[in-house]
């Protein structure tokens, strides 16, 4: 019996009997490998994307065992898309799927809001590139300084590195950290071009410290040059946030909306990812269309015919449902070099949870790392092949090569890249090491949208399999609170030492009655290293010998 699933251009054909009786993985039997490849291969003809999980050690019994779990997972994802409170800890809907198909939103107001934002972003990007919107000095904008942390930085960085071509659109620079040296280098590289630079600050709440600090540094440098901040400043934030109110008060050049129901790590199809794409002349409609097509393909409620469920099942079995294997991401295309970092946040922030939904301590997670092939073959692939077997590889390939790099002496660089990928995949399999492969006929905005959407859905399904909330981040919030406590402690230490009296870390702790001696040592080590008038007497190798004062 055959099943045919038609979802627009999507067509998957599978023989149920064959699927349920495919042979187990064999490292040495090429015929068995070929059978598994045929039985487990998924293909989307219109997108030109293949998913091959045949080199993962999943078997027919695993599919049978996971069937009921996936039935529940598919229902949960359907409810999520219909507007259920999927993030129960924060009592929020999870609506990133609506961003590429606004008609799926639970009400017309949300649908219209999404569609309007896409139009505004597209028009703004075009007008900036074409010079209809100019810098305050009357010149065309030449650069963008993008200020954002986490998903507000990684998503835009992926869009730029993956999709920008030489001399296309504006040049991009990033403040994605609060490292003073990093900020100094970016501002130094911009130089006088800061006067023709759009400064985009991204913060959902409008109160995140890192973007605020970066924004103030950019503002100070621009105003010191005699620039006009408001005429170059753009905000991407929620309506009525602190940042939104500031932008309105100061009449910034433009404001774009973020939505309460979209988390940072799934915000790439919102203004967070679309605005940078528009500013390099990228077809944002194609990017959204690719994501929407993959969403359709991953709504199929059949484990064997849904690429996201195939991938989630392979992850689950590889790590015994406990994340016992790392995911090593190996994209064989320089444009996707940032993709492993993007997946680190998407996967690890979503799945790395201490508690399940029932309050049980589970310590779930799936570690992700990687760079790009074939570079990695000359780095850590040695350990993957011969070292500890605690991972599975995710190969990503693009079949179509660019035309302006010709064959020289009948040697095509793309042939070597393909050979290196196949060779590494084969070498890992021969060693009994697991891998899956995603292949794309070509790479463009549409395929990037599809690739992102595939992993988003796989993460959502995996979260359902292990019964965790994949849409909150209590560990991140704990880190923010701890950082705020340290900054508060530093302020109190500085207030105490303002009297000029020399004190040890222990004495400071005794007077303040908060923090710890170790935290105070760290604070004072930093302060004394930065010429703020603090001195230390004693041996830095013996912390208890040190006495601190304000000179």
UniProtKB/Swiss-Prot annotation:
Protein name (record): Glucose-6-phosphate isomerase
Pathway: Carbohydrate biosynthesis; gluconeogenesis; Carbohydrate degradation; glycolysis; D-glyceraldehyde 3-phosphate and glycerone phosphate from D-glucose: step 2/4
Catalytic activity: alpha-D-glucose 6-phosphate = beta-D-fructose 6-phosphate
Residue pairs linked by disulfide bridges in the UniProt entry: none
PANTHER family found in the cross-reference section: GLUCOSE-6-PHOSPHATE ISOMERASE
Localization per record: Cytoplasm
GO terms under biological process: gluconeogenesis; glucose 6-phosphate metabolic process; glycolytic process
Coarse class of the protein's main subcellular location: cytoplasm
Function: Catalyzes the reversible isomerization of glucose-6-phosphate to fructose-6-phosphate.
GO cellular component entries: cytosol
Gene3D superfamilies noted in UniProt: Glucose-6-phosphate isomerase like protein, domain 1 (3.40.50.10490)
Any GO MF annotation of the entry: monosaccharide binding
Active site as annotated: 349 (proton donor), 378, 480
Family from the record: Belongs to the GPI family.
InterPro entries: G6P_Isomerase, Phosphoglucose_isomerase_CS, SIS_dom_sf, SIS_PGI_1, SIS_PGI_2
HAMAP family per record: G6P_isomerase
Keywords: Cytoplasm, Gluconeogenesis, Glycolysis, Isomerase
Superkingdom of the source species: Bacteria
NCBIfam families in the record: PRK14096.1 (NF010696)
Enzyme Commission number(s) from the entry: 5.3.1.9
